[in-house]
Amino acid sequence: MAYVKEHAPSEVYHLTKKENLNSILEDGRIRRFGDTECWFCIDLQKMKAYMEQTVMCEGKPYYSVTGQLCRYPKFVPGDYVLLKLTPCRQEDNWYRWEQEIPAGSPAELVRAAHEFSLLKIGYRGDLAFHNAEAIDVPRFLTEGVTQGEPVHTSTELWDTLSRRIEDEMADYMHRLDLRTRDELIQTADEIDAMMTCDCELRLLGECLPREELVFLLEQDRPLEQMSKAWMEHRNVDLGETFQSLLTGLYAGQQHNMDMKM
């Protein structure tokens, strides 16, 4: 096989199992996982043609990254998600894999191999991305749906949350300035809880699990929500216990949602 240098695309499409989506968004990267490159298609027409010649061909043989002969399993569209991604950096690191065909091969085989090689493009390394959209695969295949739902990486979620926290804390400090000395003394525990939660959230940052970042962004005043819970549990230690408190709040919300269904 031979590699051909390609211009950096402005956006790419990547097919993956739904079960991988959360970890991909937490990571903010498409990983190579043992390969030299991670692979994409530059438009949906190429992606559909690529799928029709690979994952949609049940029983078709292929070689894995390790060189092992495998066969494609039964294709279940609902198990997959199609990601539209914008690469973070326009690096000169893109290649097309041109499949080599033995000399003397029929012209039809040579043409088919070349056309297949044009379907995908590889990024040499792990691709960091932003502005992701998740396209529903069943609807893409049956209805031609090309518009996806925006999905956010942990870094993007934390950037939004940190701005929310900063604004909320600034508003809180302004309101503290309006309190009398006696009111400040009476609300010392509340003030301590707000300061503690602000500090702990900033220390944890984007290391928080993605679902907990989403949970906090769903709250009108995330710092106030956390500080109230912290005051109820103020006898616990800092650090990991703060994380446990947040995890407990998230789990409680999920339990309440499950009970309503």
Identify the residue ranges that each predicted region occupies.
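ADP-ribose/NAD+-binding catalytic cleft of ART/PARP-like enzymes
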Residues: 1-39, 52-55
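Non-Sec secretion/translocation targeting segments of pathogen effectors
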Residues: 14, 254-261
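Residues immediately flanking
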Residues: 18, 42-44, 85-87
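Surface-exposed flexible segments
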Residues: 19-36, 91-107, 240, 244
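Short, well-structured alpha-helical interface segments that form or flank functional binding sites
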Residues: 36-42, 80, 188-192, 196
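Short active-site loop/helix that positions an aromatic residue
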Residues: 44-62
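Active-site and NAD+-binding cores of ADP-ribose-processing enzymes
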Residues: 57-160
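Protein-protein interaction and targeting regions used for scaffolding, dimerization, and localization
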Residues: 158, 162-255
